[in-house]
């Protein structure tokens, strides 16, 4: 489990020194349009509730399987993702989400 307050602090610290902060998340596999709309709304509400102090440069909620590097503004940026395939295909540095706080703390 990630400490959302700590995550928010680290994201804001990095944004203050010039990092662009974004989210790219998949919808569920095979979801219908109306269901996907509800899931998108729920994911955005979750971000606002749990790390609402972060000002996102971009948020993309996309169909399952969409190559994440193809829908973001900075495909050579840093990705945290639990899917190994997404990490392998990413054009920049990619990490598992397990140590996100520690990795962010090490960034300047």
Could you tell me what each predicted segment is?
Residues 1-4:
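Short catalytic helix/loop segments, enriched in acidic residues and glycine
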Residues 21-23, 29-34, 67-70, 86-89, ...:
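Short catalytic/ligand-binding loop motif for oxyanion handling, primarily in non-cytosolic enzymes
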Residues 24-28, 40-69:
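A short, structured active-site edge motif that brings together acidic residues
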Residues 58-85, 90:
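Conserved Lys-Pro-Asp/Glu-containing loop-to-beta segment of HAD-superfamily phosphomonoesterases
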């Amino acid at each position: 489990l990630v400490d959302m307050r700590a995550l928010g602090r680290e994201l804001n610290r990095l944004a203050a020194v010039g990092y662009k902060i974004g989210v790219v998340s998949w919808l569920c596999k095979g979801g219908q349009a109306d269901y996907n709309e509800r899931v998108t709304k729920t994911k955005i509400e979750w971000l606002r509730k749990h790390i609402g102090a972060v000002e996102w440069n971009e948020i993309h909620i996309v169909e399952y399987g969409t190559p994440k590097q193809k829908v973001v503004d900075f495909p050579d940026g840093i990705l945290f993702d639990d899917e190994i395939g997404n990490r392998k295909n990413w054009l920049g540095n990619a990490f598992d989400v397990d140590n996100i706080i520690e990795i962010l703390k090490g960034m300047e």
